[in-house]
Amino acid sequence: MNYTLSKRLCLTAMLTLAAVVYTTSAFAETSKLVIESGDSAQSRQEAAMEKEQWNDTRSLRQKVNTRAEKEWDKADAAFDNRDKCEQSANINAYWEPNTLRCLDRRTGRVITP
């Protein structure tokens, strides 16, 4: 009986020691988690700076878009004019690809098909 009691005491001591070691390691591994609303002074300042930069580049973006649109319109108009020139009833009309104009073979002047 004495042998069983010593076994139980030893087992209890080992479990207690294991529990202490486990809890101290658990305390050592915890970290602090802070959840912010995202409304700090730094984030507001960064947002204001990004908005200012976006507004400053707005005119440049509009100019680039306008230029691209004009170039596309010019190419589209030239394509339509080429079709009209090639389908023209005028035998002397030909399409000049370098100048994107319909010209008269005899005179070299611009004609409207």
UniProtKB/Swiss-Prot annotation:
The keyword Cell membrane does not apply. It holds the Pfam family DUF1283. Residues 1-28 form the signal peptide. InterPro entries: DUF1283. Keywords: Signal. Disulfide bonds: none annotated. Belongs to the UPF0482 family. This is UPF0482 protein YnfB. The gene is ynfB.
